[in-house]
């Protein structure tokens, strides 16, 4: 894969990142996507540009976004006993035709590096068993399962990583 451009999104170039995130959300969760825009995407600058616990990274091929990853301040909505300055890794998605080329791993490495450079030491994420190979991928990135939750809506796997 030649000439991929990885970059941290700033306040002047986030519109296409939001559009891509909404598109991927609809692909992954069509039954809950009904046109509502999540709070973090409505307030992108607040969550990902101005907040020191926020970061949003895109990767482009021929000026088209083909993948993203982000972190934001964890809101402690699950009772998981995580450190106060934990960030939540969100929005990892690579278009299917670009997968199996190491792009997701490179996005993770860039995100982890950014977090370390900003004195972040605790990462949290959750994934779902219906996402193929997600738990295995995150384990390969150094995350450990801290809790499994079986619910009526989405079974959830909670994972964390220390930097």
Please name every model-derived segment:
Residues 68, 105, 127:
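Ser/Thr-centric signal marking residues that sit
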Residues 101, 105, 109:
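Residues forming the Rossmann-fold NAD(P)(H) cofactor-binding site
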Residues 108, 115-126:
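Conserved GNAT acetyl-CoA-binding A-motif
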Residues 2-6:
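Extreme N-terminal starter segment of soluble prokaryotic enzymes
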Residues 95-97, 101, 129:
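Active-site acidic-Proline motif in GNAT/NAT acetyltransferases
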Residues 8-90, 95, 108-110, 114, ...:
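Acetyl-CoA-dependent GNAT
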Residues 23-24, 85-87, 121-163:
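C-terminal "cap" of GNAT-fold acetyltransferases
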């Amino acid at each position: 894969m030649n000439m991929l451009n990885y970059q941290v999104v700033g306040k002047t170039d986030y519109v296409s990142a939001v559009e891509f995130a909404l598109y991927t959300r609809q692909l992954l969760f069509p039954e809950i996507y009904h046109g509502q825009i999540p709070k973090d995407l409505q307030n992108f600058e607040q969550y990902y540009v101005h907040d020191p616990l926020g970061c949003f990274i895109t990767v482009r091929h021929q000026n088209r976004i083909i993948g993203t990853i982000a972190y934001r301040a964890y809101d402690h909505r699950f009772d998981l006993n995580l450190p106060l300055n934990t960030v939540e890794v969100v929005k990892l998605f690579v278009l299917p035709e670009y997968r199996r080329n190491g792009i997701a791993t490179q996005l993770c490495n860039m995100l982890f590096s950014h977090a370390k450079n900003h004195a972040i030491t605790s990462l949290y994420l959750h994934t779902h068993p219906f996402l193929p190979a997600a738990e295995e991928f995150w384990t390969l990135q150094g995350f450990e399962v801290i809790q499994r939750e079986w619910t009526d809506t989405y079974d959830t796997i909670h994972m964390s990583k220390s930097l």
